[in-house]
Amino acid sequence: MTVLKLSHWRVLAELADGLPQHVSQLARMADMKPQQLNGFWQQMPAHIRGLLRQHDGYWRLVRPLAVFDAEGLRELGERSGFQTALKHECASSNDEILELARIAPDKAHKTICVTHLQSKGRGRQGRKWSHRLGECLMFSFGWVFDRPQYELGSLSPVAAVACRRALSRLGLDVQIKWPNDLVVGRDKLGGILIETVRTGGKTVAVVGIGINFVLPKEVENAASVQSLFQTASRRGNADAAVLLETLLVELDAVLLQYARDGFAPFVAEYQAANRDHGKAVLLLRDGETVFEGTVKGVDGQGVLHLETAEGKQTVVSGEISLRSDDRPVSVPKRRDSERFLLLDGGNSRLKWAWVENGTFATVGSAPYRDLSPLGAEWAEKADGNVRIVGCAVCGEFKKAQVQEQLARKIEWLPSSAQALGIRNHYRHPEEHGSDRWFNALGSRRFSRNACVVVSCGTAVTVDALTDDGHYLGGTIMPGFHLMKESLAVRTANLNRHAGKRYPFPTTTGNAVASGMMDAVCGSVMMMHGRLKEKTGAGKPVDVIITGGGAAKVAEALPPAFLAENTVRVADNLVIYGLLNMIAAEGREYEHI
């Protein structure tokens, strides 16, 4: 795997904590002269070489690594009650403990093998565990149970509970994806592989754990302890030895209780940490979907309970893998010929969409002074199976104008305390603008992350929605036209055409245009910062922008902000919210 000698491993372990080390000390460890160290360092892997910084006779790495020395590991094991073995390179740490378990099962109990590189590292279902030297904390240990293998089906989730406890003790907020992945939102932090050997009337479970210590640049959708540590505003760097010792202490305590009491005492804790509890998921075998539904929880055996269209299902882990259901919401066919006309009654204009088979057939809009295009479309397209559903903030007079164009009663939907798995934290939901509510509901079609939902219309609203379905509220400010109108009416010298946006405007018109845009962008970025802090754990916070000024706002946001975050312009967001709502009604109808 590498051509590193023992001297390379000693020096690397000395530098792994990221603290400065004098070259004389490093040279003694490498058994060479200090002036030979630079050539010696060039033999390190490329991704390690670039981490070195030299200053005034001291070397340090710009980020810590998960690299150990045998003596330090032995002392750590003694404090934690484990025997230790260090393998700089091996096929698999699980294989090392499995071999020991077959030869001497009692010796395998609480013996831990830590490795830096694995040529055949694997996860559940034989998946390859990808890593580079120093990026991942990888270890395996044995635990002897006086139970047959079939009674240890919940060992995997209980090990995940122990790991999460340890990470929590270090100030890191981590979730569990059934059955045993450690995740931060959509990003995977670590995984657990359990293999068993039955011998002498006892079962030796070999627990293999891999946790990303630093962010692996060659792996997508990954999280790391180091990045979470920095996000949590902890001083200094994460320390791999502290992480490992904390994990061993928690694993020891949890497995002792598990051996005595089973999984039942841990169920509530697991439920609270389960990322997908109450959410839609897909369960796959060999890449094919075998179940889709909503996660209802796990039981005392670690079995997943799922609510599906066909009823309740129970799923053991086995060769099943779980994925969040990110497919766009569509409208189930409740009646073979049912169609919808969806209305978005804004302050200035009415928008509408004809929906057939769960998708927009046509989309239109008109000012309230002339709604004849809506009436013409109704005369052309309507039949006895069209249902009209709308959201309006335009006031009763304009709603009456809309009704005059249509020969069927409109169902105007208000804001509510809860819908589609989203809880509305507005103090008085009946006072909450329904457009803001349906914008939030519609945003779930474009992002399952926490997101800032921005609507640029007569007013600009900037709202916050968490990844776990809490609408937190938001701000309202005048839209671009109202800001310009206010300046024209309330000032003596600013009643002029707005110019263009510039970083440093030098004309009054340009200053007005730039100031208005800066106000909106600043409001968006401030809300994003608040939501980012509240969401925590390095989770992404997206920005979804809708309305007539959406494209201009997205273009005006700073390049650095755009590079670091997902910003998306979504037309007709209110109508998407209505579409999601009637889709949910369709699911309820089908279950009756």
UniProtKB/Swiss-Prot annotation:
Signal sequence interval, chain numbering: none
Co-factor: note: A monovalent cation. Ammonium or potassium.
Residues annotated as catalytic: D435 (proton acceptor)
GO molecular function: ATP binding; biotin--[biotin carboxyl-carrier protein] ligase activity; pantothenate kinase activity
Keyword rRNA-binding: no
Pathway the protein contributes to: Cofactor biosynthesis; coenzyme A biosynthesis; CoA from (R)-pantothenate: step 1/5
Positions with a binding annotation for ATP: D344, G345, G346, N347, S348, R349, L350, K351, T458
Subcellular location: Cytoplasm
Family, as annotated: In the N-terminal section; belongs to the biotin--protein ligase family.
Cited HAMAP family: Pantothen_kinase_3 (MF_01274)
Protein's name according to its UniProt entry: Bifunctional enzyme BirA/CoaX
Native source species: Neisseria meningitidis serogroup B (strain ATCC BAA-335 / MC58)
Lineage: Bacteria, Pseudomonadati, Pseudomonadota, Betaproteobacteria, Neisseriales
Gene coding for it: birA/coaX
